[in-house]
Each structure stands twice: as structure tokens, then as C-alpha cells.
């Protein structure tokens, strides 16, 4: 048996302000920092140690991981950051308050992009500064691979090769793995691990700052999963 720990970053400024964040680099709020500290304490108390940690290119996930490892007193794990673990890209909605987005684009299109697996948000213009292809930190990536906006399905498809080709082999080698990422990316991983249906996925909630522990068999099939702060099986926050 091996363990895998999934953690959604602590509350960000955009979470607090009710904005679509996506690839926008919103920092943690003081509450988000406390959530990261609490997660670190829970993992330390449970005796967790990590050989390798995976996270996105976004500061709210990076800072959550940094705080967790500091609280745990762990400076030695390898940390790999990759854009494929970035949050779902919200296209033209990036950085916009949800109510403003509804007023601009209409209630039904916004609701559809939030509740339907295959519904993308309104796309960005490629000339928009919010397009990752126009940002220096993604300059080494083929612009054709970078999103102008993503449905849930498209975000999962972008993440999946990294899970299969990079993260899974580390788990199979017996490495103790922590993934600090984002709501939709973690939902995609949970869908993959647990074989959830699309209907089950739509109902799935992943709380900020709560470590979700998976116990896996030799074939990486889940034996059970539970939150570190409750020990209770389940995903909802």
C-alpha cells in the first residue's frame, strides 16, 4: 500500500472576492495562509513525509506548498512545478467578478460553463495579455498548447498526460507524493482515481486547505480516502 496526498491551495484573494481566477496569479489571503499552516500541522501530526511534491506554476499553490513544508519541517523534498497542473483557464472570464460576468455575458452561458462538463467559457482573444502565450513565464511552451479558455473536459485532458507520464511513475516507484493544486485539477484527479461519472464529478467539491489522503494498492487503485482533519471518507468540503 502507498499513500498519495492531494491538497487544494488555501483561500486566494480571488476566492474571497468572488472572481474567476483560472491562470490569474492571485495571492493567498491571510485566511489562506492559515489554512496552509493548518494543513501542514495536520500532515505533521499524522507523521507524513514526502519524497516529491508536484504543484502548478501559480503562486497560490506554490505558497501553500511552501508553508506546508515549512510547518512540517521538511526542506528536502523534490518540488516539481508544471503548467499542466494550473487551474482550468476561464478564458474571457479570468479576473472578473462572477456577478459582473453574469451581467456581461448572461446568466445561462455562465451557469453552463460552470455546470456542464463540455461547456467552455467565452474565449480570450489571442492578443489579450491574459492569454498565457503572451506571458513570459510560458514562453518556452508552444502557444498552440496553451488555452484561450477551457471546459472541464479540456482542463482534465491537459492535466492527464502529466499525471500518467510524470506523477504516476513516481508513485509506482514507492515515492511518497504530495500534489498541491487547484479545484478543477484535483477534481479531475479524483475522477481518474475513483472512476467517477460526469454526474458525480459535477457534484464533487474540494475544500481549500484540507489534505485528502488516498491509500492505494499496488495497481494504484484506491483502497480508501479520507480527509486528514476528520478521518472521514469523502470529498466534499
From Swiss-Prot:
It is an enzyme of class 5 (isomerase). Pathway: Carbohydrate degradation; glycolysis; pyruvate from D-glyceraldehyde 3-phosphate: step 3/5. GO terms for molecular function: phosphoglycerate mutase activity. Its EC number is 5.4.2.11. The keyword Isomerase applies. SMART domains: PGAM. The active site is at residues 9, 87. It catalyses: (2R)-2-phosphoglycerate = (2R)-3-phosphoglycerate. CDD domains: HP_PGM_like. The record marks 182 as: Transition state stabilizer. The keyword Transit peptide does not apply. This is 2,3-bisphosphoglycerate-dependent phosphoglycerate mutase 1. It comes from Nitrosospira multiformis (strain ATCC 25196 / NCIMB 11849 / C 71).
